[in-house]
UniProtKB/Swiss-Prot annotation:
Belongs to the G-protein coupled receptor 1 family. Opsin subfamily. The keyword Acetylation does not apply. Residues 409-428 have a biased composition (Polar residues). Keywords: Cell membrane, Chromophore, Disulfide bond, G-protein coupled receptor, Glycoprotein, Membrane, Photoreceptor protein, Receptor, Retinal protein, Sensory transduction, Transducer, Transmembrane, Transmembrane helix. It comes from Danio rerio (Zebrafish). One of its GO terms (cellular component) is plasma membrane. This is Melanopsin-like.
Amino acid sequence: MSHHSSWRGHHCAPGDINCTAGFKESLGSRNYKLLHVPVHGPTHSHHHDPPHPFPTVDVPDHAHYIIGSVILIVGITGVIGNALVVYVFCRSRTLRTAGNMFIVNLAVADFLMSVTQSPVFFAASLHRRWVFGERPCELYAFCGALFGICSMMTLTAIAADRCLAITQPLALVSRVSRRKAGAVLVVVWLYSLGWSLPPFFGWSAYVPEGLQTSCSWDYMTFTPSVRAYTILLFVFVFFIPLGIIGSCYFAIFQTIRAAGKEIRELDCGETHKVYERMQNEWKMAKVALVVIVLFIISWSPYSVVALTATAGYSHFLTPYMNSVPAVIAKASAIHNPIIYAITHPKYRVAIARYIPVLRPILRVKEKDLRSSFSSGSVSSRRPTLTSQCSLGVSMGNAARANGRWGKTRLSSASDSDSCWTESEADGSSVSSLTFGRRVSTEISTDTVILSSGSSVSNASGQKSERAHKVISVPVPSITFETDAADGESLSDGKALLGGN
């Protein structure tokens, strides 16, 4: 039932102190009431909204409706897109890997962000105010903080995973498993929860913001407690993770550049293949980098607004300046599925395979689908880490050829079991280890690799005058218990021999 009210009364003569009678007429669709209320002085006909526990802002109605429509589109896209990411990455055997667990977790956080934020924001925008009460406001803001922080921490974990995959490939093989990736994700959620709960216990608060149709933590109140929470929140969930991400990608770039230079000097066919695999890993790292950059761009306007208010300049902020950045930040939930649908070939093929109705949109070729099906049908015992080209240096040439590419890889060549995964540590796949080739790649024309570095032999196998002992290093060809068709979760750069 719609209601409105208006003031009606007698015009009082100037100076007539006995004129205190007035009437408030409450108009409904079926009834009329006349309520006697005291008035002082002359009255005029004007409208009053009914009292409400939450404040409102004086903006045109269409502003609420436009923002509500945008957030509804963002929510629908985020729910559908991230649900597809979770479904496809969990369904496809080639994508069900330890490294991709971080991508799935990011999609879960974005999915929950879309589910909990967009419908409520849209409904409040239709009413042009927050209508759900104090506790729902706190819960709404808590969910936004929790899932937003979790997304940022997950992106940090993805950057670290890509960094290890390229700069420390064999270390990643031996150390990263699904169980350990799951443990990292548990830490991510607990860390996010730790920064989302304090407003419930009096450190800052969750309150309506902007156009008063959504809620967030209180960054507008200029008190020491509120300012301390806001500053620490940005330091530990935005700036420090941002620094870690930047450091990881700087290390990735440096490794790729150095590896390319050293491989050109070695001029070995197998090392060129290794470099190509590393380049493939770099392509995946670039996809993750695009997701990270877009996430940071989405949250940067909101960060600027919050930090501006924290610095004591909240009087410069308008309701629009608070609400629009909040909408942009919530839109970060749709970047992940869109980017992977455009740039991740295996993801596109998997969607086309499991959701045929989307094939025309994705434009996946039939031969790619057949190739994906055949690769997914082969035995899961497929080699993903094979090193048949090893590097070596003589003691006399060490000064010239013991750069990072040669020296660090050689350091682990004598300890071949450092390349094994946990699935092989129990000896269940010993038969899959094939010690086939000996060291064959030459850096100089008359040297082969030494595990101890104590002697050398020439290319024909004869001992040189300097040699006291020749040690040949068998190089294992290792087959992993994995579902990945090309070892994508392990970094194609892991075909390197060694790599601490």
